[in-house]
Amino acid sequence: MASTEQGGTDQTDRGLRKDYFNSSGVTKFIPPVFKLLEMAVAIICIGLIDDPANNSRFRVFMTARTTALAYSTFVPFLILSVIYLFGKVLRENVPWKLQSLLNLTAFIMYLATAACILSDWSETKNRNYWPPNTQRMDFQCGAGALAIIGALLYLIDLVVTVRLGIKGDIE
């Protein structure tokens, strides 16, 4: 009788350990790695759009709407990534459903921002100013391309978060 109770206790103890430690193996490191990559993309995009958005006096490289959309996309998701990573350091968990919603929102916003930045780049390229300021146009094109990469990172992070959340590996 005592041995069957211990067997049940062992199974219960394993379940408690899984709940306590939340996830095991590599799966607990996947979301923070995505957040680090997303944070790096946001920092680089902010650096790339700063010059074409703010330092062009005579020629407009980016419209005010595109600049506002870019800053209001990159900065908040940069802050959210920092908060997420800071929470991981303090061992606080973000619910996977909330994280999935934020990833979906970030994917949509990054895609819209990339479309606007590349649209402004295309319009500036087709104006045929001579001599063209290719450095600012390269910064703008690079920011648009990195915004697409950021959107793909958020999409992959969304898929991974949903899969791990449904499996129960993350809360």
Cite the ranges covered by each PLM segment.
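Intrinsically disordered terminal tails
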Residues: 1-35, 44, 51-62, 92, ...
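Signature of small four-pass
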Residues: 31-45, 49, 63-124, 143-164
